[in-house]
Amino acid sequence: MVFPDQFKNHILPDQIHILNVCFVSPELRREYGGCAGNIAYNLKLLGGNPLPMGTVGKDFQEYRQRLRTLDIPDHLVRELPELYTAQCTITTDQDNNQITAFHP
């Protein structure tokens, strides 16, 4: 996500002990990533035959379809139906400062 301002205009140093902020991001995009996925994708682009291994959650179906579209096998990916896949949300301001939230 891109924040069309600077975080420093909204995070007040003298009030950092009571930090409560909300940044409106006018656009959102989903990127397919993760270590195994990124390596598999790039190996495939280079003509290789990757075999990604990893653990994913109940929200993997869309990513699985992408892997299959790219002819990347997913039989070594373990799906845990009671959990969500780890994910990261990064918001970047106009100065390229970032605020990251990560769910393992």
Pin down the residues of each PLM region.
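Glycine-rich phosphate/adenosyl-contacting loop at the front of the ribokinase-like
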Residues: 1-53, 62
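Conserved phosphate-binding/catalytic loop of the ribokinase/pfkB sugar-kinase fold
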Residues: 75-80, 88-104
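Active-site-proximal loop->helix
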Residues: 58-71, 75, 88-92
